[in-house]
Amino acid sequence: MGFRFNDRVCVIDINDVKYSVTFQKALVDRLNEARETFGSFKADGDKENVSEVCAVFDRAIDSILGVGSAAAIFAGRFENIMERYAVLRYIYDELTAFMKSISEEKNVQPETENPHN
């Protein structure tokens, strides 16, 4: 079997809307930031007001799915920290599983390991 490039697009489905996320180094960085958001939520969640915490989650969601995605996802809904946490966690878990499947493929060059990018 020869070398081949794999599909680097993960499709995230939220409320029947599909968001295409391209696997690249910047995505890994944004996922690490999302993980930090989870940690800060656990540490400071009860100290912040709901709007501030929701805004943090919205920025994290937008950084991964694209600007305005969080507003579209939560349009017409009351601010709810747990809903935002659940959506961001779902996105994080889906992308982590996607990256794991890419890394397990044989004869595939993941972009994060390509020294020419």
Predicted regions and their residues:
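Compositionally biased, low-structure terminal segments
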Residues: 4-6, 24, 39-42, 58, ...
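Compositionally biased, non-globular sequence tracts
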Residues: 47-58
